[in-house]
Amino acid sequence: MRKTKIICTMGPSTDKDDVMEQLVREGMDVARFNFSHGPHDEQRGRIQKLRELRKKYDRPVAALLDTKGPEIRLGCFKDGKVSLEEGQIFTFTNKDIEGTNEHVSITYKELYKDVQPGGHILVDDGLVDLEVQDISGKDIVCKVINAGVIGDKKGVNVPGANLKMPFISKKDHEDLLFGIQEGFDFVAASFTRTADDIREVRKILKDNGGEEIQIIAKIENQQGVDNIDEIIEAADGIMIARGDMGVEIPPEYVPVIQQKIIQKVYTAGKPVITATQMLDSMISHPRPTRAEATDVANAIFQGTSATMLSGETAAGKYPVQALQMMSRIAEHMEENIEYNTIFKKTDRNENPDITNAIAHATCLTAIDLKAQAILAVTKSGSTAHMMSKHRPGCLIGACTSSERVLRQLNLSWGVYPMLIREEYSSEILCLRAIEAAQKHKLVKVGDTVVFAGGVPLGIPGRTNMIRVCIVD
């Protein structure tokens, strides 16, 4: 059974026929809804369909709302696009004008305050590079470094600039309220720069009844990388969004940044997602390149909790095949990981509390006894997250009475979430956990399982008991 979780992005391709249903059947763990595209009515139809499929297949597929975030875009051109030549002068202005091959408006009107001569402005994922020559009033005068064609509303990146633009736009605020109303499990906060950005999102969620929604910080610029420690502490998980990161930051730096962030988040006992262009060629082709397969495998080897498919499932020709391929790569990689070695290297001192100590002891017991599974009863999910951090090798059956926590646990590496009702006796609770594991075919008669729970029961953060049981 695959331990690495897979996120699939919803879009036009998943709207066709029974594609979303096939993705659920083939093991999609989290469905990502990209709110940079598609109105609320369109997204509402998709989340409703997902709810129906959860019920039909009894699978706790989580729903993730990915915000548009504080992005910068060009205005529109008179003819829809212009061709820029190397060496020519081109101006970005905060005036609302029709674009020509000499100038264009920009959505962030205060950008002229945040850039300096010598800095660079990149358009359309970095395909066109312009160097800032002068700030003339509120206009940014640039010289074209790389020639190319730019068109209406193309994205703009400003590497190295400390942008002061608001983190939550009016659209993002409306999308968050929509996410609360529709019962989303996660919010992915795009272009997270500081811990304050996460706190701002959390306040909106809490003030509007969405305090149970977990926040995934998307790291995709230098500010986010520089402030990664405080962001990890404030967020519930991290997404390494390598698309914009590879534009904002030199591409040769991205692999090392990815490795370091995965290690930091992994050590903190929180989920970490590696995203963007993982099987990008499968948008158009039925098989990935060897480099893409290696990229997925390398992220798993580094310790990622989940890998993500973006355009491959949202707009590609082979969405189901992309999920199947990513799943096969993950399963084969997991067969070749030395879990005992990883466990010995896990630093317990990063989180010196009762939950982490119990999680470590439970995993150690499971390794020593070669247990078939760990069964953890968890109210908030924190115990299962910590056990996932230790990579015990065996599956972690996480039992919870909360349907929201059930789905959120589906993002954690090696965790198989199961729904059980609350009990007020540790004996009965252990029995219910084993029954659930048997029902889901995690264990069979004669298997050794290690059970972890809390007394008194039902209180988050109170896991303090370990038991070894033989299934009978």
Language model: regions and residue ranges:
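Non-catalytic helical/linker scaffolds that mediate oligomerization, partner binding
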Residues: 1-472
